[in-house]
Amino acid sequence: MKFKKQFYLLFICLWAGITKTTFAQQPATYDYVVSSNGKGNFTTIQEAINAVPDFRKKQTRILLSKGIYKEKLVVPASKTNIALIGEDGAVISYDDYSNKLNVFGETKGTSGSSSVYLYAPDFYVENITFQNT
């Protein structure tokens, strides 16, 4: 009887280990990596967005490495199905405001002072702070 209990206990432990190994989460894969220190495919987010093929049917996954990226982004309508995923500490920052003057000496206004212009469908963002400084 004692042997039978030990056998069942061993079986359950082995089964749990196999199940955990079989169903373990696979590491995320990315098409592009943006890193301000030059260790990725690009040093700016806009470069990575520009590199995405127009009207791509499959999702393009872009990893944004930890850091502060001071840039104004434009995501054209042709850059479909993009997922922009940040590491902890990924920040997109820009310092426009509505009364700031443009190159013609006119105020930009609210719609002209956006930090991100998003025209593309199916754009997904995860774990990124958008900061207006």
Specify the residue positions occupied by each region the protein language model found:
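Bacterial Sec-dependent N-terminal signal peptides
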Residues: 1-27
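Acidic Gly/Asp/Thr-rich repetitive segments characteristic of extracellular carbohydrate-active
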Residues: 32-63
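Right-handed parallel beta-helix/beta-spiral solenoid domain characteristic of secreted/periplasmic
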Residues: 36-38, 61, 80-133
